[in-house]
């Protein structure tokens, strides 16, 4: 039966369409690759053979609508790659800024913690810290972040309340009334990105 079907398929492809399809606009010279793939697909499906892989032209990939994403990859956990699943991937975890930190009880938050992180209000963190750049700068200068690569045991703890009192009672910074960047000779050839360029009378062509 299989040989009969295959020989019929060969004859059909060789001599063209059957008389019943003689009035079709297609001619034997104009049989497209898509028609052949459909025919082969139907024959293989009737024979119980696995479906053949249908490859589409590259320009059809541009017709996709909506967001497209690819999930998975050789870096996501233990996988077995290859056509038979016999190639294990071994990925070493790289250390860097993107590596999630271990926020356990011992080394989770820096010392001192950032103002009142979750669950740390009883450890003496300041609930009402001033929202100023000056306090933030001083706070970060005295902050001891937990860093196992640069963790020096000689660094002592500091008193947050003492720093707060120092910042509160310290001398206020004087405001500048004059912008130092607007002093001096102005550069006329510098044009802002969104402004219309201004040309002097010397640059204009005589009419």
Curated annotation (Swiss-Prot):
One of its GO terms (molecular function) is enzyme regulator activity. Proteolytically cleaved in the Golgi by a furin-like convertase to generate bioactive peptides. It comes from the Eukaryota. Pfam families: Secretogranin_V. Residues 168-207 are annotated as: Disordered. InterPro entries: Secretogranin_V. Residues 1-22 form the signal peptide. Disulfide bonds join 116-125. GO terms for cellular component: extracellular region; secretory granule. The modification Phosphoserine is found at residues 136, 200. One of its GO terms (biological process) is intracellular protein transport. It is found in: Secreted. Its main location: secreted. Interacts with PCSK2/PC2 early in the secretory pathway. Dissociation occurs at later stages. Acts as a molecular chaperone for PCSK2/PC2, preventing its premature activation in the regulated secretory pathway. Binds to inactive PCSK2 in the endoplasmic reticulum and facilitates its transport from there to later compartments of the secretory pathway where it is proteolytically matured and activated. Also required for cleavage of PCSK2 but does not appear to be involved in its folding. Plays a role in regulating pituitary hormone secretion. The C-terminal peptide inhibits PCSK2 in vitro. Belongs to the 7B2 family. This is Neuroendocrine protein 7B2. The lineage of its organism: Eukaryota, Metazoa, Chordata, Craniata, Vertebrata.
